[in-house]
Each structure stands twice: as structure tokens, then as C-alpha cells.
Amino acid sequence: MAAVAVAVREESRSEMKTELSPRPGAAGRELTQEEKLQLRKEKKQQKKKRKEEKGADQEIGSAVSAAQRQDPVRELQGTGSQLGGTTGEKLPAGRSKAELRAERRAKQEAERALKQARKGEQGGPSPQACPSTAGEATSGVKRVPEHTQADDPTLLRRLLRKPDRQQVPTRKDYGSKVSLFSHLPQYSRQSSLTQYMSIPSSVIHPAMVRLGLQYSQGLVSGSNARCIALLHALQQVIQDYTTPPNEELSRDLVNKLKPYISFLTQCRPMSASMCNAIKFFNKEVTGMSSSKREEEAKSELKEAIDRYVQEKIVLASQAISRFASKKISDGDVILVYGCSSLVSRILQEAWVEGRRFRVVVVDSRPRLEGRHMLHCLVRAGVPTSYLLIPAASYVLPEVSKVLLGAHALLANGSVMSRVGTAQLALVARAHNVPVLVCCETYKFCERVQTDAFVSNELDDPDDLQCKRGDQVTLANWQNNSSLRLLNLVYDVTPPELVDLVITELGMIPCSSVPVVLRVKSSDQ
């Protein structure tokens, strides 16, 4: 078939040559306009004819190759005879080239399978050797690893080496932990970080040491209060800072802050508001020009901290209070949980503006923060009721709305707040009561979390002991090997249980958190 295609091409070329040859009688005189047009038409037809012949040749070549693929034995025999004629090679009697090639391929597959089996014996099963069905799986193979990323021993050892390099004391675990939360550090007020710390020779600034102790003892609590206290401590660090010789303030100050942050984390895990404030401060420090004098740079940093507190916390809470007061009407029964400084301000300002409503304060052990909220509202003259969280379902039928604070708002719209918030939101949804969450945008974080197991905080388990007179319930619980106490600090409320989030930017749904984060990152 290839020879036929070559013959057809040669014949067509000879015909085109005869067509392109000059006509007899045309030489020696100038062509008229009609003859020129006729010649152009003939050239176009010849060009079209060449294209058609070229396409036919390609179809013939593809047909030949397809026929060869369909009958590879004949092709191999032909090539084998050609090779044998040229090189003198002789095939074994009664065996074709295709059969020899198939035999070689089978040997290669057997060798490859043997190598994979040897690798599986040395370093575990290879991906190809793993069974694809449940029937092929053996009982010795574990589908789930023994350790996840959070409780991996190598990762935990690496995290412990970091404070040692920074000369920061580490807190030891206290008591036995629940297995689901074994990857989280267990804090206790009985073990002090500063017990064996020498303040004069320590790398930690005294203001940071005092702040860490206040965090660990619970003297400073609440996201806003902890963030403001941290920023004020940073101002004291800046005031006492002196740039070493042959160093730049923008680099040395950031490195000096790292052990301070590690010490505060050992005292109590950082909140989302504190992490965002530290990111802001580091950005201000690294963006400081090296040509500025030290006193001028320190003054600008302290002014930036004051501006951050004023804009992100003070003015933001004022704007949220104005937006939230529009949702409070006369005769409302508002349920609040725990003690949120922002929610307390909203209720007191709405009462001062003339709106008349009633508040139900729900509280929970062991912190009993709702007592402080109760004291503030009663002092402002707001009619208030007080109860514990197990009785919340009995008062929800008469509640008109639930007003909650937030520890952080995650990127997937989940609300991280005091443990028990998710329970209240779930019961409120069952009674068709709207849930409103008040939160500043500086508490928005890019972390995604769907449960309270992976990332959380474990408080002192001794706080769960109940003292009644001289008797202490759960005394010496550490000696009981079958007893473990769990004192969780936060839980995660899914966005489906939250109707509205009130921020200084306005009232938004939980699904708008990624939009706010993207706008904030573009503005910065």
C-alpha cells in the first residue's frame, strides 16, 4: 500500500508539471487581461488539487500504520526477516519474534515483582502491593496511624526544645489527662513557672513575667483584657529597650520578643486576639526605617500600639454597641452567658438610652463568671435573673433573643467561645430563638476548626473540686488511677446555629468571615 501511495504521488506531480508548462503559441506575445484571469484560476485549481492529494496521502499512510498495528506479528516477522537478511541473525526454529518479545516481557515483570516484594519486607508494603479491597487486607495492617500530627511524640519533643533554646522555663503536666485531649498541655496553679527563675539573670522582661503570672492565676481574663494587658506590657518593653551596637532595631527587637512570647504561651495559650496583636506589632517593627533615630522609632511604636487599642478595641466596641442596640426592643427578654465585657457594655448602654428589657444571666462552673455580669447589670439597674446552664432550657421559651460574646471567629464561620456556648446555641435553635454573636473583627482568625478536640485549652482540673464546709469533693483525685478530670475552656459553635454576627463593620452572617479577612489583608 505504501508503494501504491508513492506511485500516485509521482503521477500527480508529472501531471502538474505538464499543466504548468507554457501553452504553445503563448510565447512571443503579451497575455490579455482575460488570459491572465484564466491563468490565475488554473493556478488556484492546481493548488487546491495538491492539497487534496496531500490529504489523501496522509489518509493512506494512517491506514497503513493502523493495519500494521492490527497485525503486529506480520510486521515483526517482516522486520525479523529483514534483520536476518542484513545481519545474519537467525530466529529459533518454530518461534516468532513476537513470542520472544512476550517471553522477555514476562521475565521483566517477574523480576520487577520480586524487587517490590524485597522492598516490602525491608521498609513496609509498597503502594502497589497494598490490597485494594477489604478481603485482601490483612489483620496486621493498620489503616489509621497510631499518632496524629497533634500528639506525635517527635513533634512534642521538638516543641519542648524551643523553650529550652530560648532559656524559657517550661510547665510540667499535672495529673492524668483524658485520652482525647492528651495532646494538649495540662495547666495547674500548683506548679509555678517562676519558682526556680532568677529574675536578674533571666532573659524575660519583668513586665512580661508579671503579665504571665497574671494570666496563669486568672487575674487577667477575657480576650480584650488579655490583649490590652499584652500591648501595655510591650510598651514597657519598648521603653526599656536599647539597640545593641552593630544591630538594627527592626531586627533585634523582633528576636528579643520571641522568648517573651514563648514564656507567655507557657503560662497560658495565646488567644486569637493576642496573636493578631503580635502580628501587627511585628509588622510595625519590621517596617521601621533604619535611618530613624532610636528614640523616634520607639515613640512611633508606642503610638502605634495606642492607636491599635483605640481603633480595634475601644472604637470597635462603641460601633458594635450602636449596631446591637437596634436589635433590642422594649419588653425583650435577653439571655446572656458568662461575662463578656462587650455584651455587658451593650446592655448597659441600651438601658441608659431608655429601652426597657429583662436579662437572664446563665452561668457555669467552675469559673462562675456570670456573677460579675450579674453584679454589673444590677448596679446599672437592669432587671436580671441568674441561673446555671442545666436550667437554661426551662427559661428559653420566654426568651426573645440570645446575646453572646466570642473568643474568636474562625475562617469557616465557627464561633470559638466559653465552653457551654455551643450547648446554649443548640437549645436556642430548638426553641426558635435567634442567636446573636457580638465580636470585634480583630478577633477574626484564619484558623479553621470544626470541633473542640484538636485545638483547645485545658484549665486546672483542681478547679472542679467542690468545697462545702470542711469537706472537699474529689479530694486526692490524682491517687485514683481510674479517675480523670477534664476542665475545658472553650468550645466551637457551628455557623448553622448562629443567626447574626455584629461587628464594627455592621451585621454580617458567619459566612462573611473570609471576606472580612481578605479585605483586612489587602488593606494591610
From Swiss-Prot:
Residues 8-20, 31-40, 96-121, 161-174 have a biased composition (Basic and acidic residues). InterPro entries: IF-2B-related, IF_2B-like_C, NagB/RpiA_transferase-like. Residues 41-51 have a biased composition (Basic residues). Pfam families: IF-2B. One of its GO terms (molecular function) is translation initiation factor activity. GO terms for cellular component: cytoplasm; cytosol; eukaryotic translation initiation factor 2B complex. The keyword Nucleotide-binding does not apply. One of its GO terms (biological process) is hippocampus development. Residues 171-180 are annotated as: May bind the chemical integrated stress response (ISR) inhibitor ISRIB. The modification Phosphoserine is found at S12. Activated by the chemical integrated stress response (ISR) inhibitor ISRIB which stimulates guanine nucleotide exchange factor activity for both phosphorylated and unphosphorylated eIF2. The modification N-acetylalanine is found at A2. SUPFAM superfamilies: NagB/RpiA/CoA transferase-like. Its main location: cytoplasm. Residues 1-174 are annotated as: Disordered. Keywords: Acetylation, Cytoplasm, Initiation factor, Phosphoprotein, Protein biosynthesis. It is found in: Cytoplasm, Cytosol. The modification Phosphothreonine is found at T86. Acts as a component of the translation initiation factor 2B (eIF2B) complex, which catalyzes the exchange of GDP for GTP on eukaryotic initiation factor 2 (eIF2) gamma subunit. Its guanine nucleotide exchange factor activity is repressed when bound to eIF2 complex phosphorylated on the alpha subunit, thereby limiting the amount of methionyl-initiator methionine tRNA available to the ribosome and consequently global translation is repressed. Component of the translation initiation factor 2B (eIF2B) complex which is a heterodecamer of two sets of five different subunits: alpha, beta, gamma, delta and epsilon. Subunits alpha, beta and delta comprise a regulatory subcomplex and subunits epsilon and gamma comprise a catalytic subcomplex. Within the complex, the hexameric regulatory complex resides at the center, with the two heterodimeric catalytic subcomplexes bound on opposite sides. Belongs to the eIF-2B alpha/beta/delta subunits family. This is Translation initiation factor eIF2B subunit delta. It comes from Rattus norvegicus (Rat).
